[in-house]
Amino acid sequence: SGTSLTDQILASNTKVSSLGEVGYADEMAVQVKELSGKHYPQGLSELTQEDISLLRATFLGKISQSHSDNVVLIDKTPMNFQYLGLLAEVFPSAKFIHCSRNPMDNCFSIFKLAFADDQDYAHDLKSLGDHYRLYKGLMDQWKEMYPQRILDVRYEDTVSDIQEQCVRLVEFLDLDFEPEMLEFYSTKRLVRTLSASQVRKPIYKSS
């Protein structure tokens, strides 16, 4: 869907650090159950301001000091879309970049990749289609709830005109455009995703 590409472009800005796919939102959802006695999302409405402050402090406590001076921190975990409501409440100033792609291309790309066995939907095309519909419905709901805090970035648009998408991204995040973002593939950082090799190359349209 272009998450790794968008992440690498943004991480090429000197004011941005990417945490990678850390999965902290998963852990936060478990904490919601511990604090409220109810699973997320039902438990979200039961949280006190003290609970929310604790969730925020726990999340931030896991972030390395090396990221502390940056204006923007990115958690690019793809499954974070499930927890957008939780993240929005815990971090009132957070913004969300929704990376999307043509549904058929997106699903087939997932199907071809060797995802973990706990993601059973990724190994069956019908299950992938069902999963995509659920994801799309949830994202539509989040966009209604937080219209000013979500930016849609389509993979096809980035490939077609990377400079225009860079401008959209920095304006959304209140950052300055830096030319290095256009040469994201030159940025020296560790990328631990199945798309790692792709973000080491200039934009191409064959994926």
Model-derived regions, located:
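Acidic, metal-coordinating catalytic cores used for nucleic-acid/nucleotide bond scission
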Residues: 78-79, 157-161
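Short runs of predominantly hydrophobic/aromatic residues within well-ordered alpha helices
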Residues: 80, 93-96, 103, 107, ...
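Conserved P-loop NTPase nucleotide-binding/switch module
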Residues: 87-91, 97-118, 122
